[in-house]
A protein has these predicted regions:
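Cell-wall polysaccharide-cleaving catalytic domain and substrate-binding groove, primarily
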Residues: 1-95, 104-119
Length: 120
């Protein structure tokens, strides 16, 4: 379950996202997927423990995830990309990359796609 207190259908949708992203039941997660970093081409799963900022916020190189050299910074329960993190951190006044901040960001993305009312 997400940590945010929200409508039960929104909570269920967030759970579905976490399952589909492979984070909810990730073999290393210690926090329901909120601590999962995208697995790179090397196949080594990884988690993070510092929620003060997005794991890729301070210059950590993105992970190569295929043989074409494509890279990802996907992190957290909903595999949120660093590319969008600074914008949403400011817009939503998110203090950190904690589970609550990740939930709030995910709900904002759903809202922006016009799907929030459909989920309720």
């Amino acid at each position: 379950m997400p940590v945010i207190n929200t409508h039960q259908n929104i909570a269920a949708f967030l759970d579905m996202l976490a399952v589909s992203e492979g984070t909810a039941n990730h073999p290393l997660t210690k926090n329901r997927g909120y601590d999962v970093i995208v697995t790179g081409l090397d196949g080594k799963p990884e988690i993070f423990t510092d929620y003060s900022d997005h794991p890729f916020a301070h210059g950590r190189p993105a992970k190569v995830f295929n043989h074409r050299g494509e890279k990802s910074t996907a992190s957290g329960r909903y595999q949120q990309l660093y590319l969008f993190w600074p914008h949403y951190r400011k817009q939503l006044a998110l203090p950190d990359f904690s589970p609550l901040s990740q939930d709030r960001l995910a709900i904002q993305l759903i809202r922006e796609r016009g799907a929030l009312d459909d989920i309720r």
